[in-house]
Amino acid sequence: MINSLLTRVFGSRNERQLRQLNRLVTQINALEPTIEKLSDAELQAKTPEFKQRLAAGESLDKILPEAFAVCREASRRVLGMRHYDVQLIGGMVLHLGKIAEMRTGEGKTLVATLPVYLNALEGQGVHVVTVNDYLARRDAAQMGKLYNWLGLSVGVVYPGMPHSDKHAAYAADITYGTNNEFGFDYLRDNMALSRADRYQRKLHYAIVDEVDSILIDEARTPLIISGPADESPELYIRVNRIVPQLTKQESEEGEGDYWIDEKGKQVHLSEAGMGHAEELLLQAGILENADDGLYAAQNLSVVHHLNAALRAHAIYQRDVDYIVRDGEVVIVDEFTGRTLSGRRWSDGLHQAVEAKEGVPVQRENQTLASITFQNLFRMYKKLSGMTGTADTEAYEFQSIYGLEVVVIPTNRPTVRKDHPDQVFLNRKGKFNAVLADIEDCAKRGQPVLVGTTSIETSEMLSEHLRKAGVKHEVLNAKQHEREATIVANAGQPGAVTIATNMAGRGTDIVLGGSLEAEYHVLGEDATEEARFKIKTDWQRRHDAVKAAGGLHIIGTERHESRRIDNQLRGRAGRQGDPGSSRFYLSLEDNLMRIFASDWVQKAMRMMGMKEDDVIEDRLVSRQIEKAQRKVEAHNFDIRKNLLDFDDVNNDQRKVIYAQRDDLLDAESVKDNVDGIRGDVIYDLVARFVPPNSVDEQWDLQGLEATLESELGMPLALRELAKTQEELDAEQIAAKVQTAVDAHFAEKEAAVGADTMRALEKHVMLTVLDQGWKEHLAKMDYLRQGIYLRGYAQKQPKQEYKKEAFELFSEMLENVKREVINLLARVRIRSEEEVAELEEQERRQAEARLLASQFQHQDAGGYGADEEVEQMQGGNAPVPVSQVTRDEPKVGRNDPCPCGSGKKYKHCHGQLS
């Protein structure tokens, strides 16, 4: 009550922030008459002037009003577009490192030019992150005219571009690209074998377009660079023949071999199913010994393949989750409906789907590098974003990224009419109503956009419309090459456009069609008369569409997130235009079937509803929204769970990448090698001759054999012990250390100091990379089974953290030992041979990258769903970690980032 009273008196936090920013808008507007009087040359000279003022100590906030006024005037002259006052507010919100929620059609692309220009003046690089390559190139080309005119350089990064072009793009003041490309380039940079092979500078400032899509929808799927493993794909094909012989249970307690957990996207074998599967696998010769059982240690690989095959057959559907194109299985993005060419599911799922579809099965992949979007974007010194729908996820943005959402008012009032949902008994009744609504709109000349949740639904609707003689366009994963053209024409009178989910985001649907697109077809040489005719025709169509009611949105199914539904609705009613929306639902829709309360379904059946009967009731709509909230909470738990696990990996990743940076920057790593050699030899001797031990406890024969096999150094330690009666463990350790040091000194004298320095650096880098790759594979295996610890009354996250630390420590010890072993045994005659070795390794690394896959991993691989369900209310709440934007270098006396409590130099800094 007190809160609501205070809000009425002082306004909400959002309103208070808008009032503060409006004061700055007044300052910017006051500067406009002065800025307008400047010549082009004087206006362009403002950029170097701002840079000098920043260099002299002025802050960005101090020069913001004048810089925004300059950018607005330059935009008017170059692009013919002047920023509205609400767009100035949006630009300030982005500069402050917050999220600006702006409705569709409010000009987010133009808004971004203000903070991009201001922050690019610092010369440390600004990244503008988009959802697809088309938008990155389009915005870089369009807005690049403005930035170039103002004296700033612009680059765009995209997959497959030449190395030199990518270097130049990242060196530019402003770089456009997709979230995936920025993420993969970060990982590639940390696999580079020399400084010259790296692209990115320090991650300074990023503006994320469609921030909800990138930081929330895609946050469940880590970015992974993986290469083919050695295992043959034949087992996937053999196991695939088994699965169709297993029967599905209708419920967890019903009869059959397996049941499906649709919420968690998992398949579980029943007791009977395990026995039946074992029998079938034995008959197929896949299991060799009937006494061992399916879950014997030697059969775990078979279990992995069987689980993947069950998920491929029972959960993943063709033309919904993937399509088959040119003999390949191509993933369909569940949020945008776009195909993700070149991406592969991990954990054997992609191979299982390939076997199911009868296309060539490619080898399973091994992780080479990975990172989540949460940890990637939290590395930026300053992060901001913009979208039409963020307020429903404000808590997640704040708790995970430290980003506040500010809702920006529209330039003109929204007049779109959102009709109540219509709920039908089954899908047939629902689609009959959808088709009737489409035909009615087409007859009246009202354009309609139909949103579907799958390719299958869009093609089914398309077939019905074709039979009814209704002209239409389909925009889904199979047609996304024509995406911009289809969306540009979706506002024509009577146009019918069927779109999978939110494909086509980033391009406004203009009532009457896109005037700019028609001008573009005319060309720059067109006469004024021709342009006038085009404008007159467009205005006539525009007025006709407005009279018919504007764009009508039809949703054929509620998405599991209210935000995605709001995005679809938001395509209509842009900039004060008329528009309308309606969702058609049925009890057979996934959301209703899995999550909606049973009483809704029972009530509708008890009322004797027929196929074409419809319910329009606010109570039902509230139940649907309640179901969506349940799913949103469930998905937030999954994303939070994923982040908790990846934070462990991230601490280790930071240590390894920091050490790689030190190695790449160092002129010489001799001191590192000398320190490592002392540690390795001490540990080696201690294994066979423990400190402070007596000679009866020594194993000199084992020590001699190990020195010869690992270091290539024969030492007669037993003879030494016979001749020196007073010899103790410390003296033996000193003798071995002296001999090894002499061996390394001889090697250096033979090849020269420069050659030895180059060799040491090359070996340390190569061994560290190989050790990290093998460690990632072990972490994958650990993560996949860690949730089972919950059954033993242990906290999986704590167990994961503890065992991950042990694996990491073991990996670093192995790396140190391998570095010394290699340096002791390698035979190099000249510096040219080292250079040739480095060049060969670089070529192999490039070949591995070309052969590698850039993919999103299914979040289920983290055991996320299982653990979330087990831990609800069972674990102590996990505190939200403070978001750290900037990552200072870890000092040698600082606490180690791994969390051991030791100093960095005594823990994971020992390798440095």
From Swiss-Prot:
<dbReference type="InterPro" id="IPR014001">
    <property type="entry name" value="Helicase_ATP-bd"/>
</dbReference>
<keyword id="KW-1003">Cell membrane</keyword>
<feature type="compositionally biased region" description="Basic residues">
    <location>
        <begin position="902"/>
        <end position="912"/>
    </location>
</feature>
<keyword id="KW-0653">Protein transport</keyword>
<dbReference type="Pfam" id="PF07517">
    <property type="entry name" value="SecA_DEAD"/>
</dbReference>
<feature type="binding site">
    <location>
        <begin position="105"/>
        <end position="109"/>
    </location>
    <ligand>
        <name>ATP</name>
    </ligand>
</feature>
<dbReference type="InterPro" id="IPR011130">
    <property type="entry name" value="SecA_preprotein_X-link_dom"/>
</dbReference>
<dbReference type="Pfam" id="PF07516">
    <property type="entry name" value="SecA_SW"/>
</dbReference>
<dbReference type="GO" id="GO:0008564">
    <property type="term" value="F:protein-exporting ATPase activity"/>
</dbReference>
<dbReference type="GO" id="GO:0005829">
    <property type="term" value="C:cytosol"/>
</dbReference>
<dbReference type="Pfam" id="PF02810">
    <property type="entry name" value="SEC-C"/>
</dbReference>
<dbReference type="GO" id="GO:0017038">
    <property type="term" value="P:protein import"/>
</dbReference>
<comment type="function">
    <text>Part of the Sec protein translocase complex. Interacts with the SecYEG preprotein conducting channel. Has a central role in coupling the hydrolysis of ATP to the transfer of proteins into and across the cell membrane, serving both as a receptor for the preprotein-SecB complex and as an ATP-driven molecular motor driving the stepwise translocation of polypeptide chains across the membrane.</text>
</comment>
<dbReference type="InterPro" id="IPR044722">
    <property type="entry name" value="SecA_SF2_C"/>
</dbReference>
<dbReference type="InterPro" id="IPR001650">
    <property type="entry name" value="Helicase_C-like"/>
</dbReference>
<keyword id="KW-0472">Membrane</keyword>
<dbReference type="GO" id="GO:0006605">
    <property type="term" value="P:protein targeting"/>
</dbReference>
<keyword id="KW-0862">Zinc</keyword>
<dbReference type="InterPro" id="IPR036266">
    <property type="entry name" value="SecA_Wing/Scaffold_sf"/>
</dbReference>
<feature type="binding site">
    <location>
        <position position="896"/>
    </location>
    <ligand>
        <name>Zn(2+)</name>
    </ligand>
</feature>
<dbReference type="InterPro" id="IPR014018">
    <property type="entry name" value="SecA_motor_DEAD"/>
</dbReference>
<dbReference type="GO" id="GO:0005524">
    <property type="term" value="F:ATP binding"/>
</dbReference>
<keyword id="KW-0963">Cytoplasm</keyword>
<dbReference type="GO" id="GO:0065002">
    <property type="term" value="P:intracellular protein transmembrane transport"/>
</dbReference>
<dbReference type="InterPro" id="IPR036670">
    <property type="entry name" value="SecA_X-link_sf"/>
</dbReference>
<keyword id="KW-0813">Transport</keyword>
<keyword id="KW-0479">Metal-binding</keyword>
<dbReference type="Pfam" id="PF01043">
    <property type="entry name" value="SecA_PP_bind"/>
</dbReference>
<keyword id="KW-0547">Nucleotide-binding</keyword>
<feature type="binding site">
    <location>
        <position position="508"/>
    </location>
    <ligand>
        <name>ATP</name>
    </ligand>
</feature>
<keyword id="KW-1278">Translocase</keyword>
<keyword id="KW-0997">Cell inner membrane</keyword>
<protein>
    <recommendedName>
        <fullName>Protein translocase subunit SecA</fullName>
        <ecNumber>7.4.2.8</ecNumber>
    </recommendedName>
</protein>
<feature type="binding site">
    <location>
        <position position="908"/>
    </location>
    <ligand>
        <name>Zn(2+)</name>
    </ligand>
</feature>
<feature type="binding site">
    <location>
        <position position="87"/>
    </location>
    <ligand>
        <name>ATP</name>
    </ligand>
</feature>
<dbReference type="GO" id="GO:0046872">
    <property type="term" value="F:metal ion binding"/>
</dbReference>
<feature type="binding site">
    <location>
        <position position="907"/>
    </location>
    <ligand>
        <name>Zn(2+)</name>
    </ligand>
</feature>
<keyword id="KW-0067">ATP-binding</keyword>
<dbReference type="InterPro" id="IPR027417">
    <property type="entry name" value="P-loop_NTPase"/>
</dbReference>
<dbReference type="InterPro" id="IPR000185">
    <property type="entry name" value="SecA"/>
</dbReference>
<dbReference type="Pfam" id="PF21090">
    <property type="entry name" value="P-loop_SecA"/>
</dbReference>
<dbReference type="InterPro" id="IPR011116">
    <property type="entry name" value="SecA_Wing/Scaffold"/>
</dbReference>
